[in-house]
From Swiss-Prot:
The lineage of its organism: Eukaryota, Metazoa, Ecdysozoa, Nematoda, Chromadorea. It comes from the Eukaryota. Transmembrane segments: none annotated. It holds the Pfam family DUF7627. Residues 86-121 have a biased composition (Basic and acidic residues). It comes from Caenorhabditis elegans. Residues 1-130, 298-318 are annotated as: Disordered. Residues 33-55 have a biased composition (Polar residues). InterPro entries: DUF7627. This is Uncharacterized protein B0303.14. Residues 18-32 have a biased composition (Low complexity).
Length: 407
């Protein structure tokens, strides 16, 4: 606390009562001199007048004890703390917000009833299925089914799903069809796949009609006839593309098996493909025979040598096929892999492995296969090596070289 003789006066505070030390009434010259001397003496003594006046409370007036009072000489007016400047602003802010809220237009009350909610919400049109939009056609005769499959004028205005739905919807006609009728339908299906280039559509239709056992039996016989013609007569029809589409079609899990009692169509196709493999392999073994690796055997005292089996008469008398047929079978295997691609390895891994093991020695050691056919087999062999690789991104490094220009 500074030792000052002056008295601090605050606004609104009454002056303290006059004391003997601070009275200024001029009574006499002697008294005035005494007061001057006494005031000079009091300058160097600590005064408690400020402390006593600080806490005085007069009638109707109070002092704010929370605020710190400035200390100095003479009458000083208190102007408040720095934080007091923002008190008014903080009080004005919520008032302004309330006024803005009152000025905003009030939202309409939400409808509580379900009927009102349906009226307020915009109703979206639900997506409809094709079956609900386009009515199925009723097929009454066999020619109607054949036209739906093979006639381009009829198929031009109908999708594949609609044609399949029309055929499956005519139960009365399908249940009364005999073997000759199914043979006509199967021939039209195979011709549509080969001549019009739509093997996927025909394969999908086969899966849909497979529940009819008579259709499955007739279709397997027709496929055998067309594939035999393709190999024996050097037919230029794209038979391998049709076979690959049937093998890679969306068969149900319980039907995707090459067994005669489960799926005769797949059984026939797999047997035909394995026949091509046997023809190429037997012809290659005439010039190159792969040595079998010795099996690891544990040495035992009581072990005995097993007698080597004698070659049977069938193995000694192998049928030697003509080079033209060997080349056709090799081309058929190559086209089958090229059209099916990796899906063949995913669905039929065993058949793909047999084709892979057959192609490699035929390229290197079979002189009966022509150069053009070997080139196609080599391309297929390189593609098959890529099927088993993981589809991971490889890291590549790119380097650029800049050439400075001379001024």
């Amino acid at each position: 606390m500074s030792r000052l003789a002056g008295r601090v006066v605050f606004p609104g505070e009454a002056e303290p009562q006059s004391s003997s030390t601070n009275s200024r009434a001029p009574e006499s010259s002697s008294s005035s001199q005494e007061t001057r001397q006494q005031n000079l003496a009091n300058r160097f003594k600590p005064s408690n007048n400020y402390r006593s006046n600080r806490n005085q409370v007069e009638d109707g007036e109070t002092t704010n004890s929370n605020r710190g009072k400035p200390r100095g000489k003479g009458p000083i007016r208190y102007q408040g703390n720095y934080s007091d400047r923002f008190v008014g602003r903080q009080e004005e802010a919520p008032r302004a917000e309330k006024s803005e809220r009152s000025e905003r237009p009030q939202r309409s009350e939400k409808p509580q009833d379900q009927n009102q909610r349906e009226q307020v919400k915009p109703q979206r049109k639900q997506t409809k299925r094709v079956e609900n939009v386009v009515a199925s056609e009723e097929l009454l005769e066999l020619e109607d089914i054949i036209d739906q499959i093979s006639d381009l004028n009829v198929r031009n205005d109908r999708s594949a799903a609609q044609i399949k739905r029309n055929i499956l919807g005519s139960h009365d006609l399908i249940d009364t069809m005999d073997e000759d009728d199914w043979q006509k339908v199967c021939e039209s299906m195979i011709k549509t796949a080969l001549e019009q280039g739509e093997p996927e559509f025909i394969a999908d239709l086969m899966v849909a009609l497979f529940s009819n056992k008579l259709f499955a039996a007739v279709m397997s016989d027709e496929l055998m006839k067309y594939v035999t013609k393709y190999i024996m007569e050097d037919d230029e029809m794209p038979i391998p593309s049709l076979l690959s589409a049937i093998l890679c079609a969306h068969w149900p899990r319980q039907l995707a098996k090459a067994f005669d009692n489960i799926n005769p169509i797949l059984y026939t196709i797999v047997c035909l493909i394995k026949g091509w493999i046997e023809v190429v392999r037997e012809d290659t073994e005439r010039y190159y025979k792969e040595e079998k690796k010795p099996k690891y055997q544990v040495a035992r005292e009581d072990s005995f040598e097993e007698p080597t089996p004698e070659p049977s008469k069938e193995e000694e008398e192998k049928i030697i096929e003509e080079p033209e047929m060997v080349n056709r079978c090799a081309v058929g295997l190559s086209d089958l892999c090229d059209t099916a691609q990796r899906q063949l390895w995913v669905n039929w891994m065993t058949v793909t492995d047999e084709i892979y093991q057959c192609i490699k020695p035929s390229i290197t050691h079979n002189p009966n296969i022509t150069g053009s056919v070997k080139g196609r087999l080599l391309d297929t062999f390189l593609q098959m090596n890529q099927w088993t690789k993981n589809r991971t991104a490889s890291v590549k490094h790119a380097v650029t070289q800049t050439v400075g220009t001379s001024n």
